[in-house]
C-alpha cells in the first residue's frame, strides 16, 4: 500500500474516508488516525493498525457543537457551555451515546467522547465528508503521539492510505477527556486543558438565584446574576469545582 501525503488539496483524503480507509489528520494537540466513525469495518482497521486493545473506546471528531445531539442521547446545558468556550480546542466531552454509534467505537460501553479539533485542514475534511471521525492518536499503541506528518509516516508509511500534512502540532499533548455522562463530572484523562479552566467556564455559565429583602415583608424580589458579576461567590465556586475535578482526574 502506498501512503499518499496531502497538503493543500484534501479531496483525495475525503474520498479515502468515505470509502472506509484511514487518513492521519493534524490537530492542535497531536496527529490523529481518522476513519469514518459510523463505519464499523473502518473503525476496526484503526484497532488493527495501532495494535489498540479492543477494550479501549474511541472518541469522535465532529465539526462543532451543532451536531452533538446527533450522536448523543442527551446534551446537558453545561456541555453546551463548555463546547461554546473551548471548541474548536483540546477538550473531549463524554456523553451517553445514541444507538447509531457502532459498538466497536464504544468498546462495550454506552458513552462516546466528542471533540472539535482546532485545525483548518481537519475541519475542512470533516466538512467535505459530512462524517464524524473515529480518531485516536496516530501512533502504535504505547508509542509516543506524533506531532508531525513525518512522525506519522515513520510509524505507518505503507500501512494507511493517507496523511494530511498540516505542519507541526502547536500543543503536542492529547486533549483533556471530561465525562459529563452523569454527575459528578469526572476527568478521565488529564490533557492540554486544565481543571481550573474548565471550572471557570462552568461557573461562568451558572445563573445564581437569590432573594433580596426580608422574607414575608412584601419586599422580597428575585435577583438573577451571572457568576462573573458575583466575585466572592465566583471565587469559591471555581475553587470548589476545580478541587472536585482534580479529585476525579486519572
Segments predicted by a language model, with ranges:
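Walker A/P-loop
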Residues: 220
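N-terminal phosphate/diphosphate-binding loop that engages ATP/GTP or pyrophosphate donors
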Residues: 228-250
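Active-site-adjacent structural elements in enzyme catalytic cores
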Residues: 1-215
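Generic helix-packing signal
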Residues: 17, 227-228
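Post-Walker A alpha-helix
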Residues: 223-224
Amino acid at each position: 500500500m502506498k501512503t499518499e501525503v496531502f497538503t493543500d488539496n484534501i479531496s483525495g483524503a475525503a474520498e479515502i474516508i468515505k470509502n472506509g480507509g484511514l487518513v492521519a489528520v493534524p490537530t492542535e494537540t497531536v496527529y490523529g488516525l481518522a476513519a469514518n466513525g459510523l463505519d464499523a469495518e473502518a473503525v476496526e482497521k484503526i484497532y488493527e493498525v495501532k495494535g489498540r486493545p479492543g477494550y479501549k473506546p474511541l472518541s469522535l471528531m465532529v465539526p462543532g457543537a451543532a451536531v452533538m445531539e446527533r450522536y448523543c442521547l442527551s446534551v446537558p446545558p453545561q456541555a453546551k457551555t463548555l463546547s461554546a468556550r473551548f471548541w474548536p480546542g483540546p477538550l473531549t466531552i463524554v456523553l451517553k451515546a445514541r444507538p447509531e454509534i457502532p459498538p466497536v467505537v464504544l468498546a462495550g460501553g454506552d458513552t462516546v467522547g466528542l471533540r472539535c479539533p482546532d485545525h483548518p485542514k481537519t475541519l475542512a475534511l470533516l466538512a467535505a465528508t459530512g462524517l464524524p471521525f473515529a480518531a485516536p492518536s496516530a501512533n502504535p499503541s504505547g508509542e509516543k503521539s506524533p506531532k508531525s506528518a513525518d512522525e506519522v509516516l515513520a510509524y505507518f508509511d505503507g500501512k494507511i492510505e493517507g496523511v494530511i500534512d498540516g505542519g507541526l502540532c502547536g500543543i503536542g499533548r492529547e486533549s483533556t477527556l471530561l465525562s459529563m455522562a452523569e454527575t459528578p463530572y469526572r476527568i478521565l484523562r488529564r490533557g492540554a486543558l486544565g481543571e481550573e479552566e474548565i471550572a471557570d467556564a462552568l461557573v461562568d455559565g451558572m445563573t445564581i438565584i437569590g432573594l433580596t429583602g426580608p422574607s414575608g415583608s412584601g419586599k422580597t424580589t428575585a435577583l438573577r446574576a451571572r457568576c462573573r458579576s458575583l466575585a466572592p461567590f465566583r471565587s469559591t465556586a471555581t475553587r470548589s469545582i476545580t478541587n472536585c475535578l482534580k479529585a476525579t482526574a486519572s
